[in-house]
């Protein structure tokens, strides 16, 4: 089977947004106008095609990034293939956003025209910057009360530090919003309400908007010519670029992430979606426009590149594992190079295991189509893989490569969980392990002493949904304990310790002496080990044992048994015995050495501090600030946003449980908040004593 669409006609993109910016609705409209969805699904009634897990339909928020393939005929009459990844906007699911951004070539950032740049918009924007994803901006909900396109443009500059290139101006706003001005063609598009947005009239720019349109077209040209020397010179000499040249410059600047073309409309009222789809074709990159993916040669460790080309060796990245009720476990993968056939044997280089591709599916939200072959640039769902987890590389066994791994955040909250009936214990273990394979920001462990199962994740909502999915998908009812904070411990001062481990009980004994300097790691939260042994007082082959011994103690700190952060250990001296010394003896010595040193080095308890942003009507500002202060919060500042006030604070996670209920009652349901992990900070001594008393009894 030959490739149906050329790779330059592919657009792999996602839609990223704040929780209520209208992402699912916009995706729905795209599916509707591209002919894949015959009935428009509204999130309000829980029937959107992309939101296909039951909890998403109930909560009206998108949780899993479903991948959808659809097609669009551009302005030139040529059909392009769109692979759309739907990304979640709720902060507890930022891991999903990271995963999707990793495999996208471009993105549409949605803004709510009333709120502009919201906290979660900043979070997903920063994640997109990390992966250097070209972005366009769609200012949605122009029909909403308080919609302000020009304020949103300004906020992109002040909040995100980015340059928005305005491509359209809105005609009217709020209930009067009826169309847009196209600043390249310099005409107006007015939608016909009765045709569900399928038809619009191209008319002259309204008289009262001509001057503004001229002003913004000039700004547009000034910004885009800056990226090209010849275009700048021509412009300075009074030669303006023609429309095709403007489009070419906008495309280049977007792909190089110099600026972001900005459009507007209202997906819910079906206005502005088709020009946005034309813009995806015109300005977002094809797989050929982005740099070749880099990887490490599996055998030699040399850096290699894989280009988006069917004739190159197969390389792909697994970016999502999902349980499908009909097919079982599905692995979503992006093919970067080469082609893949159903039934093929592929190499998982991260696990060093071979896998066989059973079925290969093209996904449309929650319906599927079996395919025999897939090519570079495709996003496919594979059934039958046993070993592969998120972030693994799959490739040609004869040309193995490891593509760069994704980074996953550490969980900040944990709860104990147990099945309601003893008979469900095994079923629960299976369900939790299956869910952990799907979601690397979710962890499962057994508490060694109490034997309890502990689950950890990115927030209360994250863990709520895990428990909910266990009930729905695996039919396991579970009881959960109170949420517990993922505290950490560290040391605060330098200490030097000399320790000798000696054991003699007939036959071979054990002997190891170590002298180690322990101090806070100036480079961050990781553990750092150095050896400054000269003259062989500790033979080279025993030094890994010294490091391993210290690392084994780091998982349980001296104060309350929490994992330790930010420790640096330097081995400066030691002694060994020709017969009695071994790697194990040095491991035991360094372990005991660190245990003794940790308290002397000023052990300190750390707690996760959350960045909290509360948006509240002015009437409740005093109450909100007073309440945050009572939670040991540090107010970082406040600013007006329209008629509301935005309060920024750093608050310990321990004091934020059930905050949503308090905030609702305090503001009569009118205030909202978002919370993201910010950093670990020392716990005040009075609170630390309580925590130690509580946990040392348990450990």
UniProtKB/Swiss-Prot annotation:
Domain tr-type G stretches: 8-288
Recorded GO CC terms: cytoplasm
One record GO biological process: ribosome disassembly
Xref: Gene3D superfamilies: 3.30.230.10, 3.30.70.240, Elongation Factor G (Translational Gtpase), domain 3, P-loop containing nucleotide triphosphate hydrolases, Translation factors
Domain of life: Bacteria
Pfam family, one: EFG_III
Residues reported in the UniProt entry to bind GTP: 17-24, 86-90, 140-143
Subcellular location field: Cytoplasm
Major subcellular location class: cytoplasm
UniProt entry keywords in alphabetical sequence: Cytoplasm, Elongation factor, GTP-binding, Nucleotide-binding, Protein biosynthesis
GO molecular function: GTP binding; GTPase activity; translation elongation factor activity
Annotated TM spans: none
NCBIfam families: EF-G (TIGR00484), PRK12740.1-5 (NF009381), small_GTP (TIGR00231)
Role this protein plays: Catalyzes the GTP-dependent ribosomal translocation step during translation elongation. During this step, the ribosome changes from the pre-translocational (PRE) to the post-translocational (POST) state as the newly formed A-site-bound peptidyl-tRNA and P-site-bound deacylated tRNA move to the P and E sites, respectively. Catalyzes the coordinated movement of the two tRNA molecules, the mRNA and conformational changes in the ribosome.
Protein name, UniProt field: Elongation factor G
Organism the protein comes from: Rhizobium rhizogenes (strain K84 / ATCC BAA-868)
Organismal lineage: Bacteria, Pseudomonadati, Pseudomonadota, Alphaproteobacteria, Hyphomicrobiales
């Amino acid at each position: 089977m030959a490739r149906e669409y050329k790779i330059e006609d592919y657009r792999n993109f996602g839609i990223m947004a704040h929780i209520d910016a209208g992402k699912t609705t916009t995706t729905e409209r795209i599916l509707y106008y591209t002919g894949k969805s015959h009935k428009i699904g509204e999130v309000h009634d829980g029937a959107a095609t992309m939101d296909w897990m039951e909890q998403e339909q109930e909560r009206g928020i998108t949780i899993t990034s479903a991948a959808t393939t659809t097609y669009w005929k551009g302005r030139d009459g040529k059909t392009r293939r769109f692979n759309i990844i739907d990304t979640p906007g709720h902060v507890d699911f930022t891991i999903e956003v990271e995963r999707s951004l990793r495999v996208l070539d471009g993105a549409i950032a949605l803004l709510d025209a009333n709120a502009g740049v919201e906290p979660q918009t900043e979070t997903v924007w920063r994640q997109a910057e990390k992966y250097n994803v070209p972005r366009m901006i769609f200012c949605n909900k122009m029909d909403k009360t308080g919609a302000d396109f020009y304020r949103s443009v300004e906020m992109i500059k002040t909040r995100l530090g980015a340059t928005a290139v305005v491509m359209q101006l809105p005609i009217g706003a709020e209930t009067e919003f009826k169309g847009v001005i196209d600043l390249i063609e310099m005409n107006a598009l007015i939608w016909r309400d009765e045709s569900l947005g399928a038809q619009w009239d191209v008319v002259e720019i309204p008289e009262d908007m001509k001057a503004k349109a001229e002003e913004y077209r000039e700004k547009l040209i000034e910004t885009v010519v800056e990226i090209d020397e010849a275009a700048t010179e021509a412009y300075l000499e009074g030669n303006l670029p023609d429309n095709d040249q403007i489009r070419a410059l906008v495309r280049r600047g977007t792909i190089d992430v110099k600026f972001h073309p900005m459009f507007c409309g209202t997906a819910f009222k079906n206005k502005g979606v088709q020009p946005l789809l034309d813009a995806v074709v015109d300005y977002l990159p094809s797989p050929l426009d982005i740099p070749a993916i880099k990887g490490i040669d599996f055998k030699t460790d040399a850096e290699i590149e894989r280009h988006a080309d069917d004739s190159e060796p197969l390389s792909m990245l697994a970016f999502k594992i999902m349980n499908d009720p009909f097919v079982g476990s599905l692995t979503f993968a992006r093919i970067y190079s080469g082609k893949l056939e159903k039934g093929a044997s592929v190499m998982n280089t991260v696990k060093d295991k071979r896998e066989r591709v059973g079925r290969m599916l093209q996904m449309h939200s929650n319906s599927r189509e079996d395919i025999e072959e897939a090519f570079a640039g495709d996003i496919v769902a594979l059934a039958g893989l046993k070993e592969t987890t998120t972030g693994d590389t799959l490739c040609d066994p004869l040309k193995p490569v490891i593509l760069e791994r994704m980074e996953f955040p550490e969980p900040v909250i944990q709860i104990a969980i147990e099945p309601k009936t003893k008979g469900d214990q095994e079923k629960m273990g299976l369900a939790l392990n299956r869910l952990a394979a799907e979601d690397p920001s979710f962890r499962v462990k057994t508490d060694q002493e109490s034997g309890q199962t502990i689950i950890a994740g990115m927030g209360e909502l994250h863990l709520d949904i895990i428990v909910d999915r266990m009930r729905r998908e695996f039919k396991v009812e579970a009881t959960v304990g109170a949420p517990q904070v993922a505290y950490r411990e560290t040391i605060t001062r330098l200490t030097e310790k000399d320790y000798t481990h000696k054991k003699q009980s007939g036959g071979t004994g054990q002997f190891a002496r170590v002298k180690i300097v322990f101090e806070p790691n100036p480079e961050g939260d990781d553990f750092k080990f150095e050896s400054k042994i000269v003259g062989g007082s500790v033979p080279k082959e025993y030094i890994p044992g010294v490091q391993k011994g210290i690392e084994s103690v780091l998982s349980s700190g001296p104060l309350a048994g929490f994992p330790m952060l930010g420790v640096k250990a330097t081995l400066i001296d030691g002694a060994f015995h020709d017969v009695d010394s071994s790697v194990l003896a040095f491991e035991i010595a360094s372990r005991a050495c660190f245990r003794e040193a940790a308290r002397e080095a000023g052990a300190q308890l750390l707690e996760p501090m959350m960045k909290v942003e509360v948006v509240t009507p002015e009437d409740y500002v005093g109450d909100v600030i007073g309440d945050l202060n009572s939670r040991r919060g540090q107010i970082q500042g406040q600013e007006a946003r329209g008629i509301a006030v935005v309060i920024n604070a750093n608050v310990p996670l321990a004091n934020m449980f059930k905050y949503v209920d308090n905030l609702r009652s305090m503001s009569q349901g009118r205030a909202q908040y978002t919370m993201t992990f910010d950093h670990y900070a020392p716990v005040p001594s009075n609170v630390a004593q309580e925590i130690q008393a509580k946990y040392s009894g348990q450990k």
